[in-house]
Amino acid sequence: NKVTLQTSSGNQIVLENLDDKLIEIDDEILIKKESKKIVFDQKKGIKKLSYNTLTVPYGKRFDVELSDGSIVYLNSGSSLKFPVQFINGMERKVYLDGEAFFNISENNKDIFKVVSNDAITEVYGTQFNVKSYKEDSFSEIILVDGSLGVKGLSDNQEIVSLKPGFRANVNQSNEKIEIFKVNTKIYTSWIDGRVIFRDENIDSMILKLERLYNVIITNDNKKLSDNFFNATIVVEEESIDEVMGYLKEVYNIKYQKFNNKIVIK
């Protein structure tokens, strides 16, 4: 359950074990570790793409600054495969499993693409959130600022444009895209350590709590499936015990806890 970086040569680095400093990895590539973030500098003369994979387990968060200056904030239970160095004149492409917020540096020549489990998001310079876990039935793309296009993975899919303040849902089974107007803060507040639930069903809330706190939650009370929940959690300040205590007090949810397993009665 550690944050790891798998380098292009296959070496695995446990980032949490390292002090904040400059680190040399494959082919004399230097990265800088800054608390819960790593920074890749642009190295000129690179002509061949090679990829690293940053993996963040449940209960953790980590950020990476890519070689073009774009910053990616990775949420719990997520992984990002990205080029060690982007190459001028080539599209900038990364691969996401999980959830991440992207702050993309502007580049009018080299398009930036995020390939997730069932969608491709194309941008030049913008701020947006992508949530695409394998176990989810659809991917969510939320645009905060700028403009972007979304399409399914199939070659014959047309790109759907998204405006700021809107969310695109891409169905994993048929790649159908639906657009909704949303309050983007609800979907991006996790970057600042807050998770906002608004009219959330029990199954969705359980999934998010499992990822945030690295616990296993079983719901034996099927009547709760008809209810919707509201809460705001400050993850680093509130334990899972405090969160469950709140749900018990406000929504009369009864539960038992055994180590990292919670059973809702």
Question: What are these language model-derived features?
Answer:
Residues N1-K265:
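A residue-level detector for the "anchor" residue at the start of short, highly conserved motifs
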